[in-house]
Amino acid sequence: MARPGQRWLGKWLVAMVVWALCRLATPLAKNLEPVSWSSLNPKFLSGKGLVIYPKIGDKLDIICPRAEAGRPYEYYKLYLVRPEQAAACSTVLDPNVLVTCNRPEQEIRFTIKFQEFSPNYMGLEFKKHHDYYITSTSNGSLEGLENREGGVCRTRTMKIIMKVGQDPNAVTPEQLTTSRPSKEADNTVKMATQAPGSRGSLGDSDGKHETVNQEEKSGPGASGGSSGDPDGFFNSKVALFAAVGAGCVIFLLIIIFLTVLLLKLRKRHRKHTQQRAAALSLSTLASPKGGSGTAGTEPSDIIIPLRTTENNYCPHYEKVSGDYGHPVYIVQEMPPQSPANIYYKV
């Protein structure tokens, strides 16, 4: 017979084996090589841009580098766009802002997590075997930060093509610049946009580095025609809070109604119980007479206490009637009192 220690060790080994098999069966997520969003980055190939092949669970950091001495700082606004927008280098319609590079004194790092389902309703969501595009139509200067046409997307092909869950060996070089069908544009991503001046300071304690996570961004979603309008986001939040508040009010009203109903039922039950108790107390007073009396006394004779007036008792009994059955006596038992306090009720 196995000892308890051996049983525990066997269960532990089985659990470790199952865990190892699950880890082997599940592809390990990894951090992809960060992308520096700068015109000096040689990874942005002319006419093609930068193509990456992330898997579900991977993470990608897009870095806005700090200003270097002797070189002007490059201002960019990065968008997650549809295939036709990336091909035309246009963000006029439905602009979905990812991050804004507008802080020369610090490095800004934007992290993208490739996940099919996001715990944040404003987070990014990706699907396998789909292409996603990131580009910028800014020209690098502060004055051209808000450009919606051309920019470095057209002049330097600064764009990232993310082929999620796809095999890099199965893609030919001619397919790198092709756009996906427009029917897939609606399923690209649930986008979280960021206004240039609405993001608070998220940098480190030295004030030289800033990390922006896609789950922490706020703004309108990518679906629908109002994704570029900030009012749409606030309206959606107001509608959400209004729905939650209405649900709470309805829940409180139901609780109050049930509480009042329960109190009424308990009060009615208590009143009914008191009435039954009073009836039982009267029935106990009317008890049959015992058979230990004389021979002429019948066992069915009933003794009923005489009602009194003004709490005065009368030690008197009277035979009420015996014409239609057994005689009935009304008897009031009490300790002897002075004759002055005795009243007879006729």
From Swiss-Prot:
Attached carbohydrates are found at N139
Residue ranges of the region described as Disordered? 169-228
Q: Which residues carry this modification: Phosphoserine?
A: S281, S287
Kindly report every residue range on the membrane side named Extracellular: 28-237
Q: Output the Gene Ontology terms for molecular function.
A: ephrin receptor binding
Q: Which residues lie on this side of the membrane: Cytoplasmic?
A: 259-346
Q: In which tissues is it expressed?
A: Widely expressed. Detected in both neuronal and non-neuronal tissues. Seems to have particularly strong expression in retina, sciatic nerve, heart and spinal cord.
Signal sequence, start to end = 1-27
Output the PTM entry. Inducible phosphorylation of tyrosine residues in the cytoplasmic domain. Proteolytically processed. The ectodomain is cleaved, probably by a metalloprotease, to produce a membrane-tethered C-terminal fragment. This fragment is then further processed by the gamma-secretase complex to yield a soluble intracellular domain peptide which can translocate to the nucleus. The intracellular domain peptide is highly labile suggesting that it is targeted for degradation by the proteasome.
Q: Please name the SUPFAM superfamilies in this protein's record.
A: Cupredoxins (SSF49503)
The name under which this protein is listed is Ephrin-B1
Q: How does it sit in the membrane?
A: Single-pass type I membrane protein
The UniProt entry annotates the motif Nuclear localization signal at: 260-273
Give the stretches traversing the membrane: 238-258
Q: Which GO terms describe its cellular component?
A: cell surface; cytoplasm; extracellular exosome; glutamatergic synapse; membrane raft; nucleus; plasma membrane; presynaptic membrane
Task: Tell me one GO biological process term.
Answer: T cell proliferation
InterPro entries reported in the protein's UniProt record: Cupredoxin, Ephrin, Ephrin-B_Ecto, Ephrin_CS, Ephrin_RBD
Spell out the Basic and acidic residues composition-biased ranges: 205-218
Cysteine pairings via disulfide bonds: C64-C101, C89-C153
Q: Which UniProt keywords apply?
A: Cell membrane, Craniosynostosis, Developmental protein, Differentiation, Disease variant, Disulfide bond, Glycoprotein, Membrane, Neurogenesis, Nucleus, Phosphoprotein, Signal, Transmembrane, Transmembrane helix
| Associated disorder | Craniofrontonasal syndrome: X-linked inherited syndrome characterized by hypertelorism, coronal synostosis with brachycephaly, downslanting palpebral fissures, clefting of the nasal tip, joint anomalies, longitudinally grooved fingernails and other digital anomalies.
Tell me the protein family, please: Belongs to the ephrin family.
Residue ranges constituting the Ephrin RBD domain according to the UniProt record:
30-164
Q: Where is this region: Interaction with ZHX2?
A: 263-294
Query: How is this protein organized at the quaternary level?
Result: Interacts (via PDZ-binding motif) with GRIP1 and GRIP2 (via PDZ domain 6). Interacts with TLE1. The intracellular domain peptide interacts with ZHX2; the interaction enhances ZHX2 transcriptional repression activity.
